[in-house]
């Protein structure tokens, strides 16, 4: 009977079943990779030192923004009776939302197109029936003479 493989030795070394690793993302309850973002912050040399909470906070902010854009783009796709989100839906979602539009004002979305916008001056006049009634009412009165 080999006891060293089933139980851990002195100081917790050797043998025993390995625990499943728990990532920083799981601990923080996020989907975005906290460890990778932390590595990018260090590698990018944005500062000499990076706090332990910075990658978690940044991952949470990025995850929130991605979820917000995806939700609005999904709504835009559903409005157009489509089941797949395309860049056009992302553009419509971002530009129609006041806060996201301000945040991404200088961003160009490839294959997004433009927002539909027709100047009111170029739109056709009101229907002919409504147009006939209003001029007669005004024409019935004679101008006052001094």
Curated annotation (Swiss-Prot):
Its main location: nucleus. It is found in: Nucleus; Chromosome. High expression in meristematic tissues, in cells of the root pericycle and in shoot cortical cells undergoing endoduplication of their DNA. SMART domains: H2A. GO terms for cellular component: nucleosome; nucleus. Keywords: Acetylation, Chromosome, DNA-binding, Nucleosome core, Nucleus. InterPro entries: Histone-fold, Histone_H2A, Histone_H2A/H2B/H3, Histone_H2A_C, Histone_H2A_CS. GO terms for biological process: heterochromatin formation. It holds the Pfam family Histone. Residues 1-24 are annotated as: Disordered. One of its GO terms (molecular function) is DNA binding. A motif (SPKK motif) lies at residues 142-145. Contains one SPKK motif which may interact with the minor groove of A/T-rich DNA sites. Phosphorylation of this motif may regulate DNA binding. This motif is reiterated in both termini of histone H1 and in the N-terminus of sea urchin histones H2B, but its presence in the C-terminus seems to be unique to plant H2A. Core component of nucleosome. Nucleosomes wrap and compact DNA into chromatin, limiting DNA accessibility to the cellular machineries which require DNA as a template. Histones thereby play a central role in transcription regulation, DNA repair, DNA replication and chromosomal stability. DNA accessibility is regulated via a complex set of post-translational modifications of histones, also called histone code, and nucleosome remodeling. This is Histone H2A.1. It comes from Solanum lycopersicum (Tomato). The lineage of its organism: Eukaryota, Viridiplantae, Streptophyta, Embryophyta, Tracheophyta.
């Amino acid at each position: 009977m080999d006891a060293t493989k089933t139980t851990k030795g002195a100081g917790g070394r050797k043998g025993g079943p390995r625990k499943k690793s728990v990532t920083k993302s799981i601990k923080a309850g996020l989907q975005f990779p906290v460890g990778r973002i932390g590595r990018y912050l260090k590698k990018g040399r944005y500062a000499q030192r990076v706090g332990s909470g910075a990658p978690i906070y940044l991952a949470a902010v990025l995850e929130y923004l991605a979820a917000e854009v995806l939700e609005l783009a999904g709504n835009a796709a559903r409005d157009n009776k489509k089941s797949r989100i395309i860049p056009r839906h992302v553009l419509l979602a971002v530009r129609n939302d006041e806060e996201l539009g301000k945040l991404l004002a200088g961003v160009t979305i490839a294959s997004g197109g433009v927002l539909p916008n027709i100047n009111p001056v170029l739109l056709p006049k009101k229907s002919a029936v409504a147009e006939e009634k209003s001029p007669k009412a005004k024409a019935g009165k004679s101008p006052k003479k001094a």
